[in-house]
Amino acid sequence: MAVIKLDEVNKNFVNEVIEAGKLVLGEDIVKSIKACYQCGTCTGSCPSGRRTAYRTRKVLRKVLLGLDDVLDSDDIWYCTTCYTCYERCPRDVKITEIIKTLRNIAAQKGNMALAHRKTASYVLRFGHAVPANNQIVELRGKLGLPAKSPTAQFSEKDLEEVRTLIKELKFDKLIAFDWEKMDLKE
């Protein structure tokens, strides 16, 4: 077990997380982290935790202890946002919302999982996070659906609107997107 050195602790970290999350989620939601007493129900319920080293309780504990290195960790990106922990928590801690807040803070600092950046790049390239390939178009036809779904992927005008919005929000910079290559920067 690692030793926690007081000079490495950000005593304001939990309040910074609450402040960052309250704008979008409401203060009561993110402030619920303070009710966590580390029972482990979240970790025991987590489908990601069964297949990876992800431990929800550990993430919350790091926040409560002021260990802001959690923002540099892959752990916050392993959460599938299934809300199982959220629904089972005996203290009504809004765990999934706290994880999403941590992701937002991490992303603003330039720390984002490659898989999330790639998915975001599909939105910039195709107007859809999961673009339809030839197999999907063929399957849609067999099901009696129009070959092209009504998404920005198949509408140049809508795709340009999506791209304009992304540029205005500087989301392309956040994921390090190269417009010339139409792909992520290496």
Curated annotation (Swiss-Prot):
| Class of this enzyme | oxidoreductase
Sorted alphabetically, which SUPFAM superfamilies does this protein's record hold?
A: alpha-helical ferredoxin
Name a single GO cellular component. plasma membrane
Protein residues bound to [4Fe-4S] cluster 2: 46, 79, 82, 85
Write down the EC number.
1.8.98.-
Lineage, top-rank taxon, reads Archaea
Q: Which cofactor does it need?
A: [4Fe-4S] cluster
Annotated GO MF terms: 4 iron, 4 sulfur cluster binding; CoB--CoM heterodisulfide reductase activity; glycerol-3-phosphate dehydrogenase (quinone) activity; metal ion binding
Q: Where does [4Fe-4S] cluster 1 bind?
A: 36, 39, 42, 89
- Which GO terms are recorded in the biological process aspect for this UniProt protein? anaerobic respiration; electron transport chain; methanogenesis
In this protein, which residues make up the domain named 4Fe-4S ferredoxin-type?
A: 26-56, 67-99
**Alphabetical list of InterPro entries matching this protein:** 4Fe4S_Fe-S-bd, 4Fe4S_Fe_S_CS, CoB/CoM_hetero-S_Rdtase_csu, HdrC_iron-sulfur_subunit, Helical_ferredxn
Q: How does it assemble?
A: The heterodisulfide reductase is composed of three subunits; HdrA, HdrB and HdrC.
Q: To which protein family does this belong?
A: Belongs to the HdrC family.
Q: What does this protein do?
A: Part of a complex that catalyzes the reversible reduction of CoM-S-S-CoB to the thiol-coenzymes H-S-CoM (coenzyme M) and H-S-CoB (coenzyme B).
User: What is this protein's record name?
Assistant: CoB--CoM heterodisulfide reductase iron-sulfur subunit C 2
Which organism is the protein's source?
Methanocaldococcus jannaschii (strain ATCC 43067 / DSM 2661 / JAL-1 / JCM 10045 / NBRC 100440)
